Amino acid sequence: MTFDENISRILVTDKEYDMPFSKGLLARSLSAAGMKPSESYTLAREIERDLNEQNVLKISKDELRRRVYYTLINRDYEGIGEKYLLWRRVLKKHSIIILVGGSSGVGTSTIAFELASRLGIPSVIGTDSIREVMRRSISKDLVPMLYESSYTAWTALRRSPWDEQDTKEMHLLGFERHVEPVLLGIESIIDRSLTEGTSVILEGTHIVPGLMGEKYHSMPNVIFLNLTLSSEETHKKRFTARAKVSDRPLERYLENFEIIKEINQYIVEKSKENNVPVIENVSISETVQKCLEIVTERFSNLNDEPIIDSDIY
């Protein structure tokens, strides 16, 4: 079968552009609304089959949305149907900023990309890349902690000879000094996204509730999520898995594991102080589902219209 034969002959029309019907795109939307991935793809395939049997060659996004909604209602998926419409509306009308924080190795990048896929958000930015940009504009002499890892930044602190050297307080102070300049870049991206009306997911160690500007915590479309791992064994296994697919040396993480644990606990405490959800990231699928539930709840606060009257696909 050629590539062209895989493209649906059904055209979905919109005010701005037309595109072929996509089972994958619809299945992703249904999955984000809470349907199991296998069920969502099956339903998307059935909807495409029904359209083909009815010889529908062109359908508006609005009509397709209604068909999907009523199909869900008829299959006793009323809750998923309402979420499906809610997500389509909110993502169309509002820029959504999702911030996924957590210490090294807890899985922020994996969860961020999963959320982006489910939500159809095209941009995922890791805070490590923001740190690299900040390094180009801030000299090492000015902020040496920025040029260290989050868990070794304390070694670059300027200390008096009589200061205690290797303590939890020093580790966390170094971490804070490492994070502060990166937060400037993070906040700039958030501000620009809000101004331009674009959605983005940012992920990484540098997203620390309480250290970021207070205004972001009160914005309904800026959503903070914090990931954690309580099990040392699981956390270490994540580093082992990471080392197999990247150039990051496992030994460096394990040598500094106690400091990474301290940073993890610090971020968790900061999250709780600022009413940010803390999610145990043992199972990727369960974590993604929990994150989607939290995001959906926030979406409900952004929704100010009757669902069925929406003209959004």
From Swiss-Prot:
Domain annotation ATP-cone: ranges: 8-95
Name under which the protein is recorded: 2-phosphoglycerate kinase
Domain of life: Archaea
UniProt-listed Enzyme Commission number(s): 2.7.2.16
HAMAP family tied to this protein: 2PGK
Protein keywords: ATP-binding, Kinase, Nucleotide-binding, Transferase
Keyword Lipoprotein: no
Similarity comment: Belongs to the 2-phosphoglycerate kinase family.
GO molecular function annotation: ATP binding; kinase activity; phosphotransferase activity, carboxyl group as acceptor
Pathway: Thermoadapter biosynthesis; cyclic 2,3-diphosphoglycerate biosynthesis; cyclic 2,3-diphosphoglycerate from 2-phospho-D-glycerate: step 1/2
Co-factor requirement: a divalent metal cation
Function: Catalyzes the phosphorylation of 2-phosphoglycerate to 2,3-diphosphoglycerate. Involved in the biosynthesis of cyclic 2,3-bisphosphoglycerate, a thermoprotectant.
Keyword Acyltransferase: no
SUPFAM superfamilies in UniProt: P-loop containing nucleoside triphosphate hydrolases (SSF52540)
